[in-house]
Design a protein with these regions (language model features):
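Flexible, low-complexity linker and terminal segments
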Residues: 2-24, 33, 219-223, 228-295
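Active-site diphosphate/adenylate-binding microenvironment
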Residues: 19-22, 28-88
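Conserved thiamine diphosphate
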Residues: 26-29, 153-220
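Thiamine diphosphate
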Residues: 68-146, 209-213
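Glycine-rich beta-alpha junction loops
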Residues: 70-72, 142-144, 200, 229-236
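Active-site-proximal loop->helix
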Residues: 122-127, 147-161
């Protein structure tokens, strides 16, 4: 049983036990185009769509301002119709702080990668969270510097092969990965901290809810909110495009455990999230064994 939520693969060898539900396709109006310039199999467009859907669902489109980091996702500016400011590498949280303090009613968020946030700008996001700034930071974490061709970042997991860790990340030589969500959750100024993924449809749906809740936290002025989104990067991982989701689940997903790390004042440990994910995966597998999924 996979420890990743919705990890088990649906049984396609037998007829389904219940009829399929037709879901009306929905394309966020914020999306300016159906095209982007990212690699095939990249997970970042799904993360961008989750942000767009959350903003539209909450009616925050007109107040949204994005402080954009440096990375592959910088194409966000050409594909989503929101006001934005392009920031120096790692400095988006500080720029977002300035925007929020000058325009308190704006829905201010950052969009950054793991190289931008955790390597180049770790002090920026930690101090912003510690101050309890009423803004939202969104991290798209694929465990590599995608723009440079797949070099190790601070979030790369042990054993992960990158351009500069050909034999795999070694703790003795390269140090341990930084679990940024767990770090931020322990800061008093952080009100909501979650980690999602886009490696399957269920994960995308849960991640969109996390982004929505983060924006709601900001609108209530409860403090800093943070959502980490694990994304695929088959190009930077040097694997076939179709293997991206499974690779994410078996590498990043087994270390950067998904779930709500801090909500309603309660901090949840990695061990607690892992146990909950195992339980949910077992329940799902049991439902599949009984002949179908329950609502």
């Amino acid at each position: 049983v996979s420890t990743i939520p919705l990890g088990p693969v649906l049984d396609t060898a037998h007829a389904p036990g219940a009829g399929a539900r037709v879901v009306e396709p929905k394309t966020p109006a914020l999306l300016l185009t159906n095209q982007h310039h990212l690699c095939p199999g990249c997970g970042e467009p799904l993360a961008v769509r989750a942000i767009a859907e959350a903003l539209e669902d909450l009616g925050l489109v007109d107040t949204a301002v994005c402080a954009l980091g440096i990375g592959c996702y910088t194409s966000f500016g050409a594909t989503v119709d929101v006001d934005l400011v392009q920031c120096l590498h790692g400095r988006a949280p500080s720029v977002a702080t300035g925007v929020k303090r000058m325009v308190p009613d704006a829905t201010v968020f950052t969009l950054q990668g793991d190289g931008d946030m955790v390597n180049e700008g770790l002090q920026e996001v930690l101090h912003t969270a510690a101050r309890g700034e009423s803004l939202t930071a969104i991290l798209v974490n694929n465990g590599v510097f995608g723009e440079t061709g797949g070099h190790m970042t601070a979030t790369s997991v042990l054993g992960q092969r990158t351009k500069n860790t050909i034999e795999g990340r070694d703790a003795e030589y390269h140090g341990f990965p930084i679990l940024i969500g767990d770090l931020i959750a322990r800061l008093e100024g952080a009100a909501y901290v979650a980690r999602g993924s886009v490696h399957n449809a269920g994960a995308v749906a849960r991640t969109t809810k996390m982004v929505r809740r983060a924006f709601e936290t900001q609108r209530r002025r409860e403090g800093f909110s943070f959502v980490e989104i694990l994304t695929m990067c088959p190009t930077g991982w040097f694997i076939p495009t179709g293997e991206g989701p499974d690779y994410l689940a078996s590498t990043l997903g087994e270390v950067h455990i998904m779930g709500e790390l801090k909500a309603d004042g309660q901090i949840r440990t990695t061990e607690e999230l892992h146990a909950e994910n195992v339980r949910k995966a077992a329940e799902l597998e049991a439902q599949l064994a009984r002949g179908g999924l329950e609502d």
